Amino acid sequence: MKIFLDTANLNDIKAGVSLGVVDGVTTNPSLVAKEGVSLENRINQIAEICNGPISAEVIADKRDEMVAEAEELTKISPNIVVKIPLTQDGLQATKVLSEKNINTNLTLVFSLNQAILAAKAGATYVSPFVGRVDDIGGNGMQLVEEIVTTFNQYAINTEVIAASIRHPRHVTEAARIGCDIVTIPKAVLEKMVNHPLTDKGIEKFMEDWHKNKQK
């Protein structure tokens, strides 16, 4: 399973990449806005840090404008994946872009039906939002499992990115069901690294080591 970082913060990306476990980055307009920079500048900066796929989302909401914006985004770096919301115009734009061999990530996916349509339109990736489904009383990981199972059944090449990940348990469940990718904030990555028993084990090893040296 691949791990993407869901952030537009350069320090977070540098920290994640330095661990040697980050395969790509996903951003959205809200994350970029928090950084107070233009999308083009920030994506350029991210591309200098991360060699993997970088999802950058279009702002337009009509097919032709989405396509035009996507074509401009792909000029920034060969690693750009154009992130498109799953709407009727988004599906139409995805079909056009797939025929131009431009990679797309269909985002804001909340049902298996939406995921199927994204794949039919030629999406490279589809991003079901786990946490947001949970927020309305649904089961986000069950949705991911349904998508993964269906895509496997029909040998669909579209990769599934479990998004809106809130805690390490989501990552564990995604791995167990065979999800292709999880995209996570830095806080979740840090929680995946840390474990109290690891810390206690290190303390015990060091304590025994120093005792032995004093003999």
From Swiss-Prot:
It comes from Natranaerobius thermophilus (strain ATCC BAA-1301 / DSM 18059 / JW/NM-WN-LF). GO terms for biological process: carbohydrate metabolic process; pentose-phosphate shunt. It is an enzyme of class 2 (transferase). Transaldolase is important for the balance of metabolites in the pentose-phosphate pathway. Keywords: Cytoplasm, Pentose shunt, Schiff base, Transferase. Belongs to the transaldolase family. Type 3B subfamily. It comes from the Bacteria. It holds the Pfam family TAL_FSA. This is Probable transaldolase. Pathway: Carbohydrate degradation; pentose phosphate pathway; D-glyceraldehyde 3-phosphate and beta-D-fructose 6-phosphate from D-ribose 5-phosphate and D-xylulose 5-phosphate (non-oxidative stage): step 2/3. The gene is tal. InterPro entries: Aldolase_TIM, TAL/FSA, Transaldolase_3B, Transaldolase_3B/F6P_aldolase, Transaldolase_AS, TSA/FSA_arc/bac. It catalyses: D-sedoheptulose 7-phosphate + D-glyceraldehyde 3-phosphate = D-erythrose 4-phosphate + beta-D-fructose 6-phosphate. GO terms for molecular function: aldehyde-lyase activity; transaldolase activity. It is found in: Cytoplasm. Its EC number is 2.2.1.2. The active site is at K83 (schiff-base intermediate with substrate). One of its GO terms (cellular component) is cytoplasm. PANTHER family: FRUCTOSE-6-PHOSPHATE ALDOLASE 1-RELATED, TRANSALDOLASE.
